[in-house]
Design a protein with these regions (language model features):
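Acidic, metal-coordinating catalytic segment for phosphate/diphosphate chemistry
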Residues: 65-189
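DNA-contacting surface of Y-family translesion DNA polymerases
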Residues: 1-105
């Protein structure tokens, strides 16, 4: 059982728009929440980071700029994607503006989400002042996970994850996934 779940990816090309970073963070949060539910856990803390692209000087090898992160402790542990996306998007915006003010850059190469403070979802402690999402939200998430697993990934997704995804990783050189994708299986004629 994992104590922390992270989903991070490089962008296909450097990103400058806050909207693209928010879409990426929402997508990564959704993916991390799926992993969290697979291990029957709930997270009480979420961290978001962005990595600005640094200009390369002649003769210098490529490197990332220093990452800018933001973290928050949630009012109660949860594995419900919608309850994780909202604070993640707020932190993404905060990290974006902080990076621009500190590093004077508007190009970003990478973003990520980390869920920590993971506890079993059977032993969740409630909060007297915050209404619990209840079992219905968990059942909805399980139904979404089952549909996405049986049909294909991302057939059902949250609108905040975006539709076009221009920031998505390039995968032209990826090896075919013969053992896990029917549509990539070779045909003999």
């Amino acid at each position: 059982e994992k104590k922390m779940i992270a989903t991070t990816r490089m962008f296909g090309s450097p990103v400058s728009e806050l909207r693209d970073i928010k879409e990426a963070v929402a997508t990564y949060t959704s993916r991390a929440a799926e992993k969290l539910r697979r291990q029957y856990g709930a997270a009480s803390m979420i961290s978001v980071f962005v990595v600005p692209k640094e200009e390369r000087k002649p003769g210098q090898s490529f490197r990332h700029g220093p990452s800018v992160s933001s973290a928050i402790t949630l009012p109660h542990a949860t594995c419900v994607t919608s309850e994780l996306i909202k604070p993640a998007l707020q932190m993404a915006e905060k990290a974006y503006h902080k990076s621009i003010s500190e590093h004077k850059t508007q190009l970003f190469k990478k973003a990520g989400v980390m869920l920590s403070g993971i506890v079993p979802d059977t032993t969740l402690q409630g909060n007297l002042f915050i209404p619990a999402s209840g079992n219905n939200a968990r059942m909805l998430m399980d139904a979404m996970d089952n549909i996405n697993f049986s049909m294909r990934n991302d057939i059902l997704k949250f609108a905040s994850t975006g539709m076009e995804r221009n920031w998505k990783m390039r995968q032209e050189l990826r090896s075919p996934r013969y053992t896990s994708r029917w549509d990539e299986l070779r045909e003999v004629k």
